[in-house]
Amino acid sequence: MDCAAALLPGFHPNYLLCPSRHFSSLLPKTDLSSPLKFQLQNKQLSLASSHGFSPVICNATLSDTYSETVELADIDWDNLGFGFLPTDYMYNMKCAQGESFSNGELQRFGNIELSPSAGVLNYGQGLFEGLKAYRKEDGNILLFRPEENALRMRLGAERMCMPSPTVDQFVDAVKATVLANKRWIPPVGKGSLYIRPLLMGSGAVLGLAPAPEYTFLIYVSPVGNYFKEGVAPIHLIVEDNLHRATPGGTGGVKTIGNYAAVLKAQSAAKEQGYSDVLYLDCVHKKYLEEVSSCNIFVVKGNLIFTPAIKGTILPGITRKSIIDVARTLGFQVEERLVHVDELLDADEVFCTGTAVVVSPVGSITYHGERVPYNEGGVGAVSQQLYSALTRLQMGFIKDNMNWTVELS
């Protein structure tokens, strides 16, 4: 039964029916080798998958303004960029310092009210996550590894002295928000619904201290490609004067302040015609860290290597998934220190992240020297990994990795 169909006028149930993770151990071995071109994001696809699913209860209260519209939103699905489009509903849940989150609810999307003395505004006490929902040809919806986002938020909350939702609360809230906004999920092959969970110190605090109250909020927006180049190769410049993170800092968690700190270098790079910035470590200034909002991978023959997670690099969920997919496909993958000079003779370089998935790098400029890759095209390894992961995310192959969560 569809979750909204069970609602009666005037009643305010405290649940939504949400399908649970399906058990991929019953499915055939995942085929990660079949091709799927980068250009498929801009074309209608005819592939489908038939996963099973079962209902579970989500602890979300529906506000009295909740209603359901089954038709797709009237927007230009063929020209989605990575910009914000307001949707219908957002999810809101609060708790006091020292207590636990409970009793979240779906509300009409709109502005929120914060004290000028809120901890998030004065001291940057906040985290965010990002994940996506995809529409399948049978009308069902796929989420990609939402429990990983929940776990990462919990780790970040501990670092930032904040309470956080449990993994189940986080995942159930994501499901509820996606289903409430399902008319905004792009048609197959047109994009995805970007999901943005926020955790912030919303209570008023004047002296430097953890906020007395916290808000967990989720909003969503339909999106296309993150980079303006779309799926064409991007061009990076290495930054060795400004740094994204420092040892002992917060570079390994998804705190909001990490991203404001990269805007100066990123803006300067874009003014020079580059897509983004590749940062080096702040101690030796010679080891790769990450791009402004993406992890970085280097390819040499059958070897793929990426900077190790050591406290200054965000443990990306797409990064983690690509490592597993690459090993499944027979590549040797190393997580280690990567010297900037290793870019000079690399076969390919690519970035990974929720927003970009896999983004091939066409060139990297370091100290005025431009190093091109793949003659301006998409490298074979980047293409293969992109194909394998997106086929799984979009439900075109059965998920033997047990990574997707299906909603009806």
Curated annotation (Swiss-Prot):
Converts 2-oxo acids to branched-chain amino acids. Shows no kinetic preferences corresponding to anabolic or catabolic functions, but likely involved in BCAA biosynthesis. The keyword Chloroplast applies. Its cofactor is pyridoxal 5'-phosphate. Belongs to the class-IV pyridoxal-phosphate-dependent aminotransferase family. Residues 1-58 form a transit peptide. The lineage of its organism: Eukaryota, Viridiplantae, Streptophyta, Embryophyta, Tracheophyta. Pyridoxal 5'-phosphate binds at R152, E290. Pathway: Amino-acid biosynthesis; L-isoleucine biosynthesis; L-isoleucine from 2-oxobutanoate: step 4/4; Amino-acid biosynthesis; L-leucine biosynthesis; L-leucine from 3-methyl-2-oxobutanoate: step 4/4; Amino-acid biosynthesis; L-valine biosynthesis; L-valine from pyruvate: step 4/4. This is Branched-chain amino acid aminotransferase 2, chloroplastic. The modification N6-(pyridoxal phosphate)lysine is found at K254. It is found in: Plastid, Chloroplast. The active site is at K254 (proton acceptor). GO terms for biological process: isoleucine biosynthetic process; L-leucine biosynthetic process; L-valine biosynthetic process.
